[in-house]
């Protein structure tokens, strides 16, 4: 009888006993597609670059800056100190990207800015003027100096509020009037509401003076200077500062005078103008910064408004002087007062004003107010990052206090102070400590603030000459602003100089040793994702963050790589964790509104995750998982058993030599699950194929997304190149090759061997008399040679017959239960092999033998 057998893909499962006829045990340089075995042509070398053994292309950075189109390979040299390089895709010269031996976990890019993400922070590289300029978060440090005008010796001004007799007397619970009004009044308790009115009336007199000049400041004003990025967000702060005008806390009640027939009250104070100067610590960031903005609150006297007893008496005349010594608020009340004061943007200055003194103006309370989410001063380190929807996603992250040189605000009074070595030990509420070593002037500003949450206190260790000093600052954790604030006040004047206590050299050196190795980590989360602002790699709004339970996130991948940016859908982003895969869904504003687990598959090789047109592929303990939306399937189940090594077959080397097929290329000896542990994948977009290779093996698997079947090719690859839609990889010679090679014209050598076939007669002995291989190919010699194997037990095989053409005839002899067909030859790219026709006869049991 005649059996028509169609050749299928490479399989290892089910076992040889249960497999179907036409399945392949060996498939060299062939892939099953369109019901045929098609040749896989060799990849073509592209570009001129040649990489050394330890050099790996981690990223391809492409873009357009002012009409200048660029496309660069970002290369990591894993030998030595781990240098990073860039090279034009058409060039061969490697140019260093200076990262100061920074350990990088992943690389991504947005526009012309590269982002190198590591555990200890993030490095950025800006492409401009044909080079990469690197910078990091601490490079945004800037110095702030405040100058007072007129100078500190400006005389006090007196401001008076006048009242009529009846109006004034109504302000007191008890009062008596002397018989002679010219002598004065003897007053009782000054009510809180009365004091509030008096101070308000005096303030009105002050405001009348201020109306003449918008640059004059009264009382106490708090403020902050913020460095402004290209998109209007803020990336660094000067810290909280104070504009302090002298206010005498004596409220004096005056007797009637010749010019005013009634009482009056007065207070003395100074009014000043202020100038502020900002200077950058480095010019690395000048192309990203557009200037700086200044936010101030409405000035406040900070006086304690409450009931006060009668003022002092004149001891000689026994008449009341009616002078009240008012108190300032302090401690918790002072901090609460500061928290309640909105900050208003009073000025915006551009880069031309950097390094110059600019005049400050008072806020009027209608300007734009400060939002704490506008400031992102902490650096962020992470296990990895991923760019999706035009936003940078960081996972398994740590927030790091990157600025070791504390941005002290310097006042006029500090200009003459000598610089000294400081160590700041910042103690957080959770018990964690952050150590900073820096050089600053010995005079500490009146208001000291840090962009650190839950900061309890800071111990300052100060060395000047041979002397060692110590001082502790206690902090208030602001509920309104992203600062921990420390304010020192004595009487009516904020301290601009702090008394340090003497300490010993040992204490200083112990803290110095800790500061040298401090990781500066403020907080961390293994189960959360920080999502940046759109088109900004450095700003991460709190509302954009999302968590995935208590799992540790190991990798992220978008549902579709080619159109991932700006896409919305049911499953736009997957998070691969140590407990399975989570699916994150976006709302219309690009914020993650929901998250849920998809499956319990754990990715075992996060560097090998691959994105195709409509699916994510990754390795797990079961094999390669294809994730499409909410559904998933294992595409390597057919390979999940013991692989077949053709070299164990009789006369295998002689047969392989006829087609110059290397024996190592058909020696499948590693189980697929072990193979996947170090495997990488490349997606051939144009052919809809997946190439799976392990650099330590001589064969690579190739999978057709159209047919869902496997083949193999020679493995000449050592690493992949992530550059969609090209299917690029680096070969063992260090050259970049394209797996999609439509211009190939040469013959492709191939070899395949089927799995055991029963020919529709299982467990029955049979004899094959002739065999013809069918397909679309020229009937030339060496197009298709045949070898026929037979066995009765699936383990011991004999070579029955061979042929140099597609025809195998004249076979006779002992019948067998199982047969294998091996074919060897070469095909042109357009040719293919479909199957075979077999003339087979079961053993005749009713014949004489």
Predicted segments with their positions:
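Exposed low-complexity, polar/acidic, P/S/T/G-rich flexible segments that act as propeptides
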Residues: 294, 489-513, 742-776, 826-849
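Beta-sandwich interaction modules
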Residues: 101-108, 373-381, 464-480, 790-841
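Disordered, low-complexity "stalk" and linker segments at domain junctions of extracellular
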Residues: 1-54, 59-65, 86-531, 544-545, ...
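Conserved loop/turn at the beginning of each blade in beta-propeller domains
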Residues: 52-53, 100, 378, 549-552, ...
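Extended, low-complexity, turn-rich repeat/linker tracts enriched in Gly/Pro/Ser/Thr and Asp/Glu
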Residues: 440-446, 775-783, 828
């Amino acid at each position: 009888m005649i059996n028509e057998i169609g050749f299928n893909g490479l399989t290892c499962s089910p076992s040889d006993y249960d497999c179907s006829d036409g399945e392949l045990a060996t498939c060299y340089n062939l892939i099953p597609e369109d019901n045929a075995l098609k040749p896989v042509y060799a990849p073509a070398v592209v570009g001129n670059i040649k990489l050394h053994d330890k050099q790996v292309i981690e990223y391809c950075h492409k873009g357009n800056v002012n009409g200048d189109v660029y496309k660069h390979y970002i290369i990591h040299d894993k030998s030595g100190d781990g240098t990073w390089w860039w090279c034009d895709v058409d060039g061969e010269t490697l140019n260093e990207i200076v990262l100061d031996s920074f350990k990088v976990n992943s690389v991504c890019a947005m526009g012309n800015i590269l982002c190198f993400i590591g555990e200890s922070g993030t490095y950025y590289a800006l492409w401009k003027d044909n080079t990469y300029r690197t910078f990091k978060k601490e490079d945004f440090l800037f110095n702030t100096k405040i100058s007072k005008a007129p100078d500190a010796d400006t005389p006090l001004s007196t401001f008076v509020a006048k009242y009529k007799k009846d109006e004034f007397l109504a302000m007191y619970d008890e009062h008596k009037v002397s018989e002679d009004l010219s002598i004065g009044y003897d007053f009782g308790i000054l009510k809180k509401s009365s004091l509030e009115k008096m101070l308000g009336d005096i303030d009105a007199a002050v405001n009348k003076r201020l109306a003449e000049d918008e640059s004059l400041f009264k009382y106490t004003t708090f403020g902050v200077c913020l460095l402004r990025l290209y998109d209007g967000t803020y990336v660094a702060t000067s810290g909280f500062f104070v504009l302090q005008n002298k206010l005498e806390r004596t409220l004096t009640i005056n007797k009637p005078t010749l010019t005013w027939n009634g009482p009056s009250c007065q207070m003395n104070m100074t009014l000043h103008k202020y100038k502020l100067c900002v200077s950058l610590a480095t010019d690395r960031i000048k192309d990203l910064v557009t200037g700086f903005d200044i936010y101030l609150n409405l000035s406040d006297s900070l006086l304690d408004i409450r009931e006060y007893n009668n003022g002092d008496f004149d001891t000689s005349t026994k008449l009341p002087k009616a002078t009240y010594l008012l108190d300032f608020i302090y401690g918790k009340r002072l901090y609460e007062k500061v928290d309640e004061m909105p900050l208003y943007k009073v000025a915006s200055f551009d880069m031309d004003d950097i390094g110059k003194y600019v005049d400050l103006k008072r806020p009027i309370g209608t300007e734009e107010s400060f939002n704490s989410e506008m400031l992102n001063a902490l650096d962020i380190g992470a296990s990895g990052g991923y760019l999706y929807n035009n936003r940078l996603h960081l996972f398994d992250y740590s927030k790091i206090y990157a600025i070791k040189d504390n941005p002290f605000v310097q006042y006029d009074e500090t200009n003459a102070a000598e610089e000294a070595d400081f160590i700041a030990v910042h103690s957080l509420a959770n018990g964690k400590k952050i150590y900073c070593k820096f050089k600053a002037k010995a005079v500490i500003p009146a208001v000291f603030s840090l962009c650190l949450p839950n900061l309890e206190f800071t111990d300052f260790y100060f060395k000047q000459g041979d002397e060692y000093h110590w001082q502790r600052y206690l902090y208030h954790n602001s509920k309104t602003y992203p600062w921990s604030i420390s304010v020192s006040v004595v009487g009516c004047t904020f301290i601009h100089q702090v008394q340090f206590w003497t300490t010993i050299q040992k204490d200083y050196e112990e803290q110095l040793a800790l500061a040298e190795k401090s990781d500066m980590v403020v907080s961390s989360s293994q189960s959360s994702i920080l999502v940046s602002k759109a088109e900004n790699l450095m700003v991460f709004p709190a509302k954009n963050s999302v968590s995935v339970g208590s799992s540790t996130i190991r990798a992220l991948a978008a549902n579709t790589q080619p159109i991932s940016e700006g896409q919305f859908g049911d499953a736009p982003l997957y998070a691969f964790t140590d407990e399975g895969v989570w699916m994150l869904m976006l709302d219309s504003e690009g914020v993650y509104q929901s998250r849920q687990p998809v499956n319990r598959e754990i990715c075992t090789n996060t560097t090998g995750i691959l994105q195709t047109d409509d699916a994510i592929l990754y390795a797990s303990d079961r094999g390669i998982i294809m994730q499409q939306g909410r559904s998933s399937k294992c595409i390597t189940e057919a390979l999940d058993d013991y692989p077949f090594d053709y070299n164990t077959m009789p006369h295998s080397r002689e047969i392989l030599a006829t087609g110059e097929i290397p024996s190592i290329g058909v020696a499948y000896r590693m189980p697929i699950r072990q193979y996947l542990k170090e495997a990488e994948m490349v997606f051939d977009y144009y052919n809809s194929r997946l190439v799976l290779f392990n650099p330590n093996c001589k064969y690579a698997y190739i999978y057709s997304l159209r047919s869902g079947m496997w083949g193999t090719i020679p493995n000449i690859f050592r690493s992949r190149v992530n550059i969609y839609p090209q299917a690029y990889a680096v070969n063992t010679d260090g050259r970049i090759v394209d797996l999609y090679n439509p211009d190939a014209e040469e013959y492709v050598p191939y070899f395949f061997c089927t799995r055991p076939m029963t020919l529709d007669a299982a467990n029955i002995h049979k004899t094959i008399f002739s065999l013809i291989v069918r397909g679309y190919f020229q009937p030339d010699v060496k197009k298709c040679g045949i070898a026929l194997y037979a066995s009765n037990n699936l383990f011991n095989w004999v070579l029955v017959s061979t042929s140099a053409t597609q025809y195998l005839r004249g076979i006779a002899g002992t019948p067998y239960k199982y047969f294998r067909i091996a074919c060897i030859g070469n095909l042109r790219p357009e040719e293919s092999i479909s199957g075979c026709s077999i003339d087979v006869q079961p053993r005749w049991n009713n014949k004489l033998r």
